[in-house]
Amino acid sequence: MQPERSIVTCDWLVVAAALSAITAILAGAFAAHAMTGKPVEWLHTGMQYQLAHSTVTMGLSRNPMWRRCAWIMIAGAAVFSGSLYVMALGAPLWFGAITPVGGVLMVCGWLCLAVKEVSHRA
């Protein structure tokens, strides 16, 4: 018999990855059906990065050694893509200054993964 699960014991990293993937899919659908011009490019760019990092996060969530790296990646994808999404929806263009912060976080997540793997093997 399996123990009962509750919202307290659920895997929040998996929840974050799933919600991130849903957001990316909705952004892509919105871009395809309701937008034109430069905002479409912003939505597509955000969607691609967010969907890729959501998928990677889901895979990394199963290894305790890599979970911190996955959290960094998913946070970076949220900041990167989120800033592009809000600009596409009409927010001031200065939100574009936030986008590189998300990119740096995604890179840091990948670097974290590489360092943990190398140090684990050493």
Label the model's feature ranges:
Residues M1-A122:
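Polytopic transmembrane helical bundles with strong interfacial aromatic enrichment
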